[in-house]
Design a protein with these regions (language model features):
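Flexible loop and strand-edge segments within Gram-negative outer membrane beta-barrel domains
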Residues: 21, 171, 195-227, 233-235, ...
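Short, acidic, small-residue-rich periplasmic hinge/interaction motif at the N-terminus
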Residues: 21-61, 82-84, 90-94, 130-132
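N-terminal periplasmic accessory domains that precede
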Residues: 38, 70-73, 112-113, 127-128, ...
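Extracytoplasmic beta-strand/coil segments of soluble accessory domains associated
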Residues: 48, 71-106
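Short strand-turn segments of transmembrane beta-barrel domains in outer membranes
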Residues: 60-61, 154-178, 674
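Short acidic/polar hinge/loop motifs at secondary-structure boundaries
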Residues: 70, 76, 103-130, 176
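Face-selective signature of the C-terminal outer-membrane beta-barrel domain
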Residues: 227-251, 275-426, 447-457, 507-512, ...
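Outer-membrane beta-barrel signature, preferentially recognizing the C-terminal barrel domain
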Residues: 281, 388-390, 464-512, 516-518, ...
């Protein structure tokens, strides 16, 4: 049977958010209305539907998603793109994930592995939230992707899988998950392992008025990661439950960098060896939910503790004119976050209201020791060795109200207040800095729907981007003895205004968006008088991006599906620094994407996917990027009543996935070419076991801040 041709919408702004209320897997009143009023029925199942504040993708209803893992499924959602296991949302600067209510605070690589640990057969729905309500943190321009497991009956189910990847070296991944639900207890656990090897080439050409400097750099690395998650939830009564969530992640990265730099006739050969050091993170969440009555009044109390400890070491050697210069960096980074949140849901007669309070306390202690070799003895560099302490506390209060004024018109208003205090202290230099700021963050969401004309949605919000801990850290991390990266403890948060108009009707989806950032953080590369160079973040950019994204989804003949998409946008940036040749920079650009799927046999268990994307040249924050194309092909074979899936894939067969850019400063130009060696062939086997219908194990940890520690 042909699948639904559906209507979609999406919103624009991205403030940090979790998935939905605990009982969100049960359709609310407006969801039931949408099923009747917003879906053009062409067959028996809806694949995508829209709500006033999110896109909802029903994975279980998409026959072309059969046998996919979590990261592959995301590429089937309008406005969402997947490149090299990295997920982006059109008009957004970053993406955060919630899996069964658990906000995932791990590295991008570990998150990709976590998504691969999920199978389409075990996913109930995926929601894309781009204008989260006031109850969630006001982080700027972040899209939230919420994945909810199936919610159908009691029992046990699980999945195991393994994946082999052939590049220059062989890599492998494996994982598994299991969940069990009774009338009183919900349990879930999963674990994943990744052992990857790769090559990263970075070539830079600096053109000065009277000479040219060329740097050719290759990094060979091996990265091993392990992640485990567990949840225990107990239902005391039908209205009261409590539980705990544990998340553990560890990473071991081993790398060796080779750099050859030619500068005014001199040739410098450098190596940077970084053996693996512990990088561990632990998150503990305790929660309780109390349903006060049968009308939906609820109180939720959540406590989060996050602890991360990361050690680093690098041995750097630069050789020139038969002379070696050696130094070592030894780093010890510790982060801890405590947060408590009280949320209330109050469905009143005229509108539904949400209100709450929250408090977060963050601590970051970092130590760096720099040694240099002199006369065959290692000496401490007291000018660069340091210890940095950073503390941050934020108090929050919010309120929001929403109402369906008619069957066609929906409105939602929210207001969030955040008061933040920060303190930074460099112990060696005995320097202390304090900073405080208070902000109000409004959100507005208006939506009108017509069965004949489609849905229109207008949204506006204000968000804030806080510096991450690495950017605040003032230490110098050397890649060669004359090239280092440093943080900046004087960085300040930047505020952004975001607006969006969405339209969807019968498989067509469009969004016109605008985002303005004031005093945003950008990275500047400068040269010292003696030829060394350094890169440092500074607040210096005002930027604006206006774009139009279009997509069209259609199925033909019951065995062929296409998803066409394109984006057209204008970017503008202005720097207040004098480093750049032109203080203003603007450009028009866009991208096109084409995804198609074929069912190749009558049993509908052999599926071929092909994906192509082309990015036109564009400018972003004073950097000019050249065009790039991406191509991938995937073949899936489902056996044993869809319990066993065999997948073969080819990614970037022609080596198109190479980033090229140009930055023009007052004193020089720099041309950069970065090749991550993305070409690969992979084979994956996955097996589902247990009952086909099992309750989801769902809980929002409401933890938002630990992403800044990554």
């Amino acid at each position: 049977m042909k699948p639904y041709v559906f209507t979609l919408w999406s919103l624009f702004f991205a403030i940090p958010m979790s998935a939905q209320d605990q009982a969100d897997s049960t359709a609310t009143n407006w969801e039931r209305q949408l099923e009747l009023k917003e879906v053009v029925v062409m067959a028996s199942r809806t694949v995508v539907k829209q709500a006033p504040d999110r896109i909802i993708y029903l994975t279980k209803n998409d026959q072309y998603a059969k046998g996919m893992n979590g990261i592959e499924v995301l590429d089937r959602i309008p406005r969402v793109s997947v490149v090299n296991d990295m997920v982006t949302v059109a008009g957004k600067s970053s993406v955060k994930y919630i899996i069964d209510g658990h906000l995932m605070e791990i590295s991008d690589e570990a998150m990709a592995l976590r998504l691969k640990n999920l199978q389409a057969s075990g996913i109930e729905k995926i929601e894309v939230l781009t204008t989260p309500p006031a109850k969630y943190g006001a982080n700027n321009n972040v899209a939230y992707i919420s994945i909810t497991s199936k919610n159908e009956s009691l029992g046990t189910r699980g999945n195991i899988w393994t994946n082999g990847i052939i590049r220059e070296s062989f890599c492998y991944q494996l994982g598994g998950n299991v969940s069990h639900t009774t009338r009183k207890v919900e349990l879930s656990a999963d674990a994943s392992w990744n052992d990857s090897k790769g090559i990263n080439d970075l070539d830079r050409t600096y053109i000065f008025p009277y000479y040219t400097k060329i740097s050719q750099r290759t990094t060979n690395y091996r990265n091993r990661t392990f992640g485990a998650n567990g949840l225990f939830k107990y239902k005391f009564t039908n209205r009261l439950n409590a539980g705990v969530i544990l998340n553990y992640y560890t990473n071991r990265l081993n790398s060796k960098l080779f750099d050859v730099t030619t500068d005014r006739g001199n040739v410098y050969s450098s190596t940077n060896y970084s053996p693996s050091r512990p990088d561990n993170a632990l998150t503990i969440t305790a929660f309780s939910d109390w349903m006060l009555d049968t009308k939906g009044k609820m109180l939720s109390l959540t406590y989060n503790y996050y602890d991360k400890q990361a050690q680093s070491f690098s041995d750097v050697t630069t050789s020139a004119n038969n002379t070696d210069t050696k130094l070592t960096n030894t780093g010890d980074n510790k982060y801890h976050i405590h947060s408590a949140k009280l949320d209330a849901i109050l469905p009143l007669k005229l509108f539904k209201m949400e209100a709450g309070l929250a408090f977060t306390c963050i601590g970051n202690n970092t130590a760096l020791d720099v040694l240099y070799l002199e006369n065959n003895s290692w000496m401490s560099d007291t000018k660069q060795s340091n210890a940095f302490e950073y503390d941050e506390s934020t108090a929050v209060a919010y309120v929001s109200a929403e109402r369906n004024f008619t069957n066609s018109f929906f409105g939602k208003l929210g207001l969030r207040y955040e008061s933040t205090r920060t303190k930074g202290y460099q112990r060696v230099k005995d320097e202390e800095s304090r900073y405080s700021y208070n902000h109000l963050f409004p959100t507005v969401n208006l939506s009108w729907n017509s069965h004949k004309a489609g849905r229109f949605t207008l949204s506006y919000s204000i968000g804030i981007t806080r510096p991450n801990f690495n950017d605040l850290n003032p230490y110098k991390y050397y890649t060669t003895t004359s090239d280092y990266v440093s943080g900046n403890p004087d960085l300040r948060p930047s505020v952004a205004h975001n607006a969006e108009i969405n339209y969807s009707f019968k498989g067509m989806y469009a969004v016109l968006y605008n985002s303005y950032n004031n005093d945003a953080i950008g990275y500047i590369t400068r040269f010292n008088n003696y030829g060394s160079q350094y890169t440092i973040p500074e607040n210096h950019i005002n930027s604006n991006k206006t774009g139009l994204y279009l997509s069209y989804y259609r199925s033909f003949f019951g065995w062929w599906n296409i998803n066409l998409g394109g984006e057209f946008f204008h970017t503008y940036a202005k720097s207040k620094l004098t480093d750049y040749k032109d203080a203003d920079d603007s450009s028009w650009s866009g991208k096109i994407e084409f995804n198609t799927s074929f069912i190749l046999n009558k049993q509908k268990n052999l599926i071929l996917d092909m994906r192509f994307s082309h990015y036109f040249p564009y400018h972003e924050r004073m950097i000019r990027y050249k065009a790039m194309s991406l191509l991938g092909c995937y073949l899936r074979y489902n056996l044993l009543n869809d319990r066993l899936t065999l997948t073969a894939s080819v990614t970037d067969p022609f080596g198109w996935n190479t980033t090229k850019s140009t930055a023009i400063y007052n004193d020089y130009k720099v041309y950069t070419r970065n090749d991550i060696h993305a070409s690969s062939v992979s084979f994956r086997i996955s097996y589902n076991f247990g009952r086909d219908k099992v309750n989801n194990v769902y809980r929002d940890t409401k933890e938002r801040e630990s992403k800044r520690a990554n």
